[in-house]
């Protein structure tokens, strides 16, 4: 019964559906509008605002199977993954929730009935914990459910403070909180461990499978616990743990999902030992990595992207340990989709981008992995203690891309720890250097808090009468402002659009008799719309009536650029694939900028196709419609939501014919034909997996095309042709240039040979070794390498040091014949010179190059060469 994890998931959701719960899809692994969380790590995350009373749903009971990641930040299981039976970076949390509906008795009954009747777990294998003073829960378990008193364990404040307990849950220092009750399963006395609350509780015999949280208090800032008017319930059960019980195994890695991934990995890498811990690591990591990419996270060097990169690189390192000689990680995605069943729907839709992203990241890391491992291995072999210094760990991170936890993982296998304090100190020094080189800007009204509300009228009008409800000057509330004052004015209603959703704020004026206030920007402050600007004439007071006039021309140009981003988004998805999602945008009167997810640069033919597709939709002159509807209806209509955005229960849906439908609160043109023309001006990468397109529309696009045409005609004139023959003429010119460069190179070689014959005679003897140190004039830097080769051949045995000085640049090269590299190494010698001329360099023992930025110090540096060589040869 329920022998697969997929069947168990379906049974859980169906059980609660038949008990009046709304089945809610798993939310993204990237929490919507919650800066406190790196990743979704519990089933209740998507319902947080419901529990806080800030969001209302059409249902009061819900159930879900939530994808979760714990890696990085406070909740970090990465170090233990693969080494224990139950630590994972990715897991699924089965849960049922009550928003002021049922409470303790029903919640306990639902859990017990599902476990003992639906799954038929033996009651004698189960015991429960409750908060020490929760007598109500004890009575329900004992009297209503029939659990013996000795199997109900009271857990008190075991974390050093009041209400700090394994059995008391709280969202934060203040807010909803309450006692919880946990259900434990006894795996049997053949496994070491004791019941909860005993000294042996950390063993693996008794495993928590279900946690039922009773939110019944609202914790105040002073610590007082006030009862909630409508108590709620939040529960969670890890699917991997209950699957292990149902499948008769002890370790989560023995369940069907992990076994399929372990066997597939072993088959790809030719591994026969299926108990190898590296196989466990890889099987776990493919789940978190694949689903994170499917949810829009791309490998990068910051934030969520860096956590993803760390997990991928850890998996790749374990693959390398198992003998992987080529990319393998991405090949596990089809197996993952197969074993995850219904939970893999989103992954299936993004399979291509997931596989390509994993493969690209693996190939990138493979270039430095072997060298980094070699350096780490050498450092570990030289250790006289059991601690690797932080400087070495930092070098591996900074130069070879080794996350510190990957270094720690390698060290752990040799029972060595990493000096993480030393690593952090080295990181801090790097940050200081970066900050010293950077500049930081401050927002004009950073931290401004406004309680007032404004109604936006700008969808249908660009001017209206309004009343001043608040004034802020220098960040403080003010009653009056006069000519010359800079301020933020809040109106009760306004046609001015406050910057949001990538659309810049409107400009314009606020006027009345004898009064003019120039609006240079409009921003949103909570529910208020703030008009930022300067008083030109008159005096403005709170409560005063003004006429708000938006600059019509600027608004119209902004609308052209905003509307076309919707067409661009749809066109990119059509040309590049459904994995494309918007990652950011900026639309103002001058241009538009659109950031989107894609694993490689957009090819020229693809850009051309996108541009043509957008212009086709412009010519079709679709009418734009904007409707307000509930979010579920919008999703059913296929409206695209922006990744990571949080939406109200009612949303505004903007539709452009049959081509584009998106959730959007911005302002737009009436018909796509109003846009006139769309022209892409640039495309490039801004982060790993994130591309950026910049473009112009309307008159700006026409001006851009006209400028390109003028440049084409100017090029034609220079090439003595017309615009139709430019390509052919340019190709012929390039071929001619290539031939001339080839001839020039041959002449330089001849010159170098001739020069070397003369220079070789200038060599001096140092302890029986011929040494040539020469500052060259009129020699191209590109000829240095060939020249030092010629000189070494002429000398047969000797050392050559050549230098060229420019206005603000120095080029150095050192050559050492191979019979002398045991005593003098070119890399060391060139480095000793380079440091004196403001540079650095290196290379092989027989040839090394360097550069510098202080030509004024070159003569003095060259004077030190002979003494340096003398010391080495003596």
From Swiss-Prot:
Native source organism of the sequence: Shewanella halifaxensis (strain HAW-EB4)
Pfam hit, one: DHHA1
Summary of the function given for this chain in its UniProt record: Catalyzes the attachment of alanine to tRNA(Ala) in a two-step reaction: alanine is first activated by ATP to form Ala-AMP and then transferred to the acceptor end of tRNA(Ala). Also edits incorrectly charged Ser-tRNA(Ala) and Gly-tRNA(Ala) via its editing domain.
GO cellular component: cytosol
Co-factor note (free text): Binds 1 zinc ion per subunit.
Catalytic activity: tRNA(Ala) + L-alanine + ATP = L-alanyl-tRNA(Ala) + AMP + diphosphate
Alphabetized CDD domains for the sequence: AlaRS_core
EC class (word): ligase
UniProt keyword terms in alphabetical order: Aminoacyl-tRNA synthetase, ATP-binding, Cytoplasm, Ligase, Metal-binding, Nucleotide-binding, Protein biosynthesis, RNA-binding, tRNA-binding, Zinc
EC number: 6.1.1.7
PROSITE patterns attached to this UniProt entry: AA_TRNA_LIGASE_II_ALA (PS50860)
Cellular localization per UniProt: Cytoplasm
Family named by the database record: Belongs to the class-II aminoacyl-tRNA synthetase family.
NCBIfam families associated with the record: alaS (TIGR00344)
Biological process, per Gene Ontology: alanyl-tRNA aminoacylation; negative regulation of DNA-templated transcription
UniProt-recorded name of the protein: Alanine--tRNA ligase
Gene Ontology molecular function, alphabetical: alanine-tRNA ligase activity; aminoacyl-tRNA deacylase activity; ATP binding; tRNA binding; zinc ion binding
Binding site for Zn(2+): 562, 566, 664, 668
Cofactor(s) needed: Zn(2+)
């Amino acid at each position: 019964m329920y022998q697969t994890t997929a069947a168990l998931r379906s049974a859980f959701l169906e059980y609660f559906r038949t008990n009046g719960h709304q089945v809610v899809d798993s939310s993204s692994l990237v929490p919507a509008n919650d800066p406190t969380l790196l990743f979704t790590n519990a089933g209740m995350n998507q319902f947080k605002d419901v529990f806080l009373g800030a969001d209302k749903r059409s249902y009061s009971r819900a159930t879900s199977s939530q994808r979760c990641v714990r890696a990085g930040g406070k909740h970090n299981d990465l170090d233990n993954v693969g080494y224990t039976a139950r630590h994972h970076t990715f897991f699924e949390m089965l849960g049922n929730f009550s928003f002021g509906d049922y409470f303790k008795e029903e919640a306990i009954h639902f859990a017990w009935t599902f476990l003992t009747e639906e799954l038929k777990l033996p009651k004698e294998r189960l015991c429960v914990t409750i908060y020490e003073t929760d007598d109500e829960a004890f009575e329900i378990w004992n009297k209503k459910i029939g659990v013996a008193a000795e199997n109900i364990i009271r857990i008190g404040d075991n974390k050093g403070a009041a209400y700090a307990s394994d059995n008391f849950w709280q969202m934060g220092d203040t807010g909803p909180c309450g006692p919880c009750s946990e259900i434990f399963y006894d795996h049997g006395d053949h496994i070491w461990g004791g019941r909860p609350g005993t000294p042996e509780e950390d063993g693996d015999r008794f495993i928590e499978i279900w946690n039922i949280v009773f939110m019944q208090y609202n914790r105040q800032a002073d610590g007082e616990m006030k009862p909630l008017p409508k108590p709620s319930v939040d529960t969670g059960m890890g699917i991997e743990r209950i699957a292990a019980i149902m499948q008769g195994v002890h370790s989560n890695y023995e369940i069907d999902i992990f076994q399929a991934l372990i066997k597939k990995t072993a088959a790809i890498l030719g591994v026969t030992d299926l108990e190898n811990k590296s196989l466990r690591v890889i099987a776990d990591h493919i789940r978190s990595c694949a689903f994170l990419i499917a949810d829009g996270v791309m490998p990068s060097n910051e934030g969520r992207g860096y956590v993803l990169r760390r997990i991928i690189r850890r998996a790749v390192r374990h693959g390398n340990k198992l003998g992987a000689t080529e990319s393998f990680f991405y090949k596990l995605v089809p197996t993952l989709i197969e074993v995850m069943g219904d939970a893999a729907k989103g992954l299936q839709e993004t399979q291509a981008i997931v596989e390509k992203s994993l493969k690209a990241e693996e190939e990138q890391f493979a270039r430095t992995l072997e060298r980094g491992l070699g350096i780490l291995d050498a450092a570990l072999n030289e250790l006289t203690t059991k601690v690797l210094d932080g400087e070495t760990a930092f070098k591996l991170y900074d130069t070879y891309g080794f996350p510190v936890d990957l270094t720690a993982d390698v060290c752990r296998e040799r029972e060595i720890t990493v000096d993480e304090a030393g690593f952090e100190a080295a990181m801090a020094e790097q940050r200081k250097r970066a900050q010293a080189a950077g500049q930081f800007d401050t927002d004009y009204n950073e931290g401004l808090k406004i309680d007032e509300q404004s109604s936006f009228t700008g969808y249908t009008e660009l001017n209206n009468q309004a009343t001043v409800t608040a004034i802020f000057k220098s960040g403080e509330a003010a009653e009056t402002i006069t000519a010359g004052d800079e301020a933020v004015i809040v109106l009760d209603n306004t046609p001015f659009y406050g910057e949001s959703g990538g659309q810049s704020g409107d400009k314009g004026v606020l006027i009345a008799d004898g009064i003019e206030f120039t609006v240079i920007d409009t921003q949103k402050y909570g529910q208020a719309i703030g008009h930022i600007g300067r008083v030109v004439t008159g005096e403005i007071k709170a409560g005063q009536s003004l006429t708000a006039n938006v600059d019509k021309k600027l608004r119209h140009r902004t609308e052209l650029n905003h509307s076309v981003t919707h067409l661009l988004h749809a066109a990119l998805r059509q040309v590049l694939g459904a994995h494309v999602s918007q990652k950011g945008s900026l639309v103002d009167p001058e241009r538009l900028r659109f950031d989107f997810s894609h694993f490689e640069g957009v090819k020229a033919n693809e850009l051309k196709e996108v541009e043509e597709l957008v212009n086709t939709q412009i010519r079709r002159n679709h009418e734009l419609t904007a409707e307000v509807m509930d979010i579920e209806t919008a999703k059913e209509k296929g409206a695209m939501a922006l990744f990571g955005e949080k939406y109200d229960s009612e949303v505004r849906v903007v539709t452009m014919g049959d081509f584009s439908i998106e959730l959007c609160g911005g302002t737009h043109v009436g018909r796509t034909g109003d846009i006139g023309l769309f022209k892409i001006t640039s495309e490039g990468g801004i982060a790993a997996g994130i591309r950026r397109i910049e473009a112009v529309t309307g008159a700006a696009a026409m001006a851009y095309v006209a400028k390109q045409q003028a440049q084409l005609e100017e090029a034609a004139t220079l090439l003595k042709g017309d615009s139709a023959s430019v390509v052919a003429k340019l190709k012929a010119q390039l071929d001619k240039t290539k031939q001339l460069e080839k001839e020039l190179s041959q002449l330089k070689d001849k010159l170098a040979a001739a020069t070397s014959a003369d220079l070789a005679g200038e060599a001096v003897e140092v302890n029986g070794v011929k040494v040539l140190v020469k500052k060259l004039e009129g020699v191209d830097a590109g000829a240095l390498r060939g020249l030092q080769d010629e000189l070494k051949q002429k000398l047969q045995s000797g050392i050559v040091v050549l230098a060229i000085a420019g206005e603000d640049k120095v080029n150095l090269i050192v050559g050492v014949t191979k019979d002398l590299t045991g005593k003098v190494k070119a890399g060391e010698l060139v480095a000793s010179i380079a440091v004196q001329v403001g540079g650095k360099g290196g290379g092989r023992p027989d040839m090394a190059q360097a550069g510098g930025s202080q030509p004024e110090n070159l003569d003095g540096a060259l004077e030190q060469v002979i003494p340096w060589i003398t010391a080495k040869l003596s």
